[in-house]
Structures are given as C-alpha cells and as structure tokens.
Amino acid sequence: MHPRFQSAFAQLAENLQSALAPVLADEHFPALLTAEQVTMLKQATGLDEDALAFALLPLAAACARADLSHFNVGAIARGVSGTWYFGGNMEFLGATMQQTVHAEQSAISHAWLRGEHALNAITVNYTPCGHCRQFMNELNSGLELRINLPGREPHTLGDYLPDAFGPKDLDIKTLLMDEQNHGYALTGDELTQSAIAAANKSHAPYSQSPSGVALECRDGRIFSGSYAENAAFNPTLPPLQGALNLLSLNGYDYPDIQRAILAEKADAPLIQWDATAATLKALGCSNIDRTLLA
C-alpha cells in the first residue's frame, strides 16, 4: 500500500478495510475502482453507492498534493461505465497559483483521460467552489450532473450553478468528454507519440489550440495529459496538469519524471510552452522538449 493511504485506511470500517486491502496492496494502485470492484465493495459492506462513495472519500483526499494550503480536498467521479475515479487537489510550490488543480478537476480529468465517456455523479468532501462549478458545466453531462456532499441531499450541478453560462451559449456542440480526434499524425518515439495522441484528444473549441503533454518516469511508465478548455476561459485545465495529475494519482512523485514532451501547433493562438517549461522546472524536471503538430 502506498504510504499516503495508510492513515485514511486505518479510519475505515473494518469490513471496508478487509475488502479494500487487496485492491490497495499495489504501491501504484491507479486511484480508480472498476465497476466490478465497486460491486464487490457494496456487497462486502452493505452500503449503497452514495454511502460507499462517502466512505471512500478519505482515500481520495489522501491523493491530494496540497503542498501550499495543507487543505486536502478529495473527489470521486462516477462514470457511466461504472468505474469510479479518485481525484485530489494539487498545488505546485515554485510555480503560480494559476497552475493549481482542484479536486473536482482532478477526478474529472482522471476519468476523461482514462477513456470515460460521461459522468453520472461526483462526490466531494467540501462544497465545490465557483471555479469547479464552471469547470463541470463544460461536461457533456451538463447541468444534470449529480453532486453529492457529506450531510446533504444530492443536488444537480444546475442547483449549484443557477443561470449558468456555458458552451451552449457560445454555440459549442462538442463538449468535454465527448469523443474527439484532431487527426495529427503520430510520429517520433513513444513519448512523442503519446504527447501527440493526447493533443488529438484535446477539448479546445474556443482557441483551436490543441495540445498534449507526455511525461516519462524513470521506470519507463508514461503519463499523458490533454488540454481541456472552458467557456469561461479561466477554469481551463492545461495539458501538463492532466499529465501530472495521472502521474501523482498512480503513486509516482515529481522526482520520478526523467523526460517531458509538449505537443502543440507552432502558430496556435495560445501557446503552452513557457508555462509548461516553467512549472516542470519548478518541480525539478529540466529535460523538456516540444514537438510541433502538423
């Protein structure tokens, strides 16, 4: 079990501990539960889905990297496939606050980058901030997404974001988590191809500036992140954050990164290179390359 889970695991009910122990045994547990594992945990504990998600929130919060605030927020995104995806807030010392990943963004990006096509619900241990409510409004689940908070009845995103502004106001038809492929040819080595594939998956309807980042760890594992724009612009999630989020959720740390590649268009209206390189250098990675989409 990864050390980050030990304290939270000790606080779980005994029957949940017994059922989860084999799942968490891998130090690189991927911070997700398959539909089969969710069913197994429900049977082992007698909990329904909402109650089980609440019981698991301490494990999601343990995934947070709150190096500045020391305020761990955890979220669990529940996919239509039945898979549950953990997420936690991420803060990057030496970078800027604008590089922060919120827990809801973490869980949603996690689900999206794992190939989930839509969400039924998201469970969070603290009320979503306005930034996250706006981020969630970009999803193809729209204002019907169910939000579960401890001690409260479930509500929809529409309840938390009345009179919402979103992609439909800008006549955007393809939404976040809809399948997209920008069609750029996969060239170069495996890491470069991973970055291009991530760029192809980008949700960039406002700037037409697709981009992707791929990170290679010292053991050869590769984690990729895709760019996710938002109708309100500021809640946009850069591709580096998507990749760092996956890396961290899988039990790796920033010193494990030995090489990084950004894929983007040379003539794009928005460029990720400077912010990507600055953040990676703040995290101790200086082996950073850029490949141009063509």
Swiss-Prot record:
One GO MF term attached to the UniProt entry: zinc ion binding
PROSITE patterns xrefs: CYT_DCMP_DEAMINASES_1, CYT_DCMP_DEAMINASES_2
GO cellular component terms listed in the entry, alphabetical order: cytosol
Reaction(s) catalysed (UniProt annotation): cytidine + H2O + H(+) = uridine + NH4(+); 2'-deoxycytidine + H2O + H(+) = 2'-deoxyuridine + NH4(+)
Keywords associated with the record: Hydrolase, Metal-binding, Zinc
Binding locations of substrate: N89, M90, E91
Homology family: Belongs to the cytidine and deoxycytidylate deaminase family.
NCBIfam families the UniProt entry points to: cyt_deam_dimer, PRK09027.1
Function comment: This enzyme scavenges exogenous and endogenous cytidine and 2'-deoxycytidine for UMP synthesis.
Assembly with partners or alone: Homodimer.
The protein's name in its UniProt record: Cytidine deaminase
Gene this protein is translated from: cdd
